[in-house]
Amino acid sequence: MKLTVLGGGGVRSAFLAKSLAYNAHRIGLTEVVFLDNSADNLAIFGEIARYVFNTIRPDIQFSTTTDPVAALQDANYIITTLRVGGDESRIRDERIALEHNTLGQETTGAGGFAMAMRSIPAILRYCRLIEEHAAEDAILFNFTNPSGLVTEAIIKSGFKRRVYGICDAPSELIRELPAILGCEERDLSVECYGLNHFSWFTHFTVRG
């Protein structure tokens, strides 16, 4: 089972590698490829990810590449975590928005819209490559922000694979709530709407 990460040269690569390594047995993962368009970033963060796999799951075949076709060939799972324009573009987006007294955050408001304008064309190009080279039953997990807009664009493009838009912001809050409410996480029931950094909870219930 092959998993490909698009944007594998980012600063969070080591954390993603650790999570994948510890949970590989759940999906029968045998091969992981981290793709990035920056060989310099892969030489740093990709190699850290390699060390993680070699330490935790040395039996898994791990590689890095700047070649999207090689990365996506026969991939069963694809995770996208792109930052088109790099951190410099994020800084520019947020500062321009703040200068006009509007929200500069990268998933909502003017900053989020600017990021969507860069992210969507790049993601759709990768989607075409996924259709051409990945396994027929491949599943795409989109972490690229703004996740809601990007995932909607993928679906509306006619993408012929399953796709899920993912964000860990709501789940992080759920993990913090038990300490606030004085209960165990298993005793907590929540109702959450929205996606990404623009989600909200309507109510929390402890033990029913």
Task: Locate each region found by the language model.
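Substrate/ligand-engaging "lid" and interaction regions
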Residues: Q61, K160-R162, I166-G208
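N-terminal Rossmann-like NAD(P) cofactor-binding module of classical short-chain dehydrogenase/reductase
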Residues: L72, N76-T81
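NAD(P)-binding Rossmann-fold cofactor-contacting core
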Residues: I27-R50
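Gly/Ser/Thr-rich loops at beta-strand to alpha-helix junctions
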Residues: G9-S13, A39-N41, N142-V150, A169-E172
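Short acidic low-complexity segments
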Residues: Q61-Q73
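Short, surface-exposed basic-aromatic patches at helix termini and helix-loop junctions that form
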Residues: Y22-H25, R50-T55, E132, E152-V163, ...
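Rossmann-fold NAD(P)-binding glycine/threonine-rich loop
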Residues: V84-G158
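N-terminal Rossmann-like dinucleotide-binding module
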Residues: L3-V32
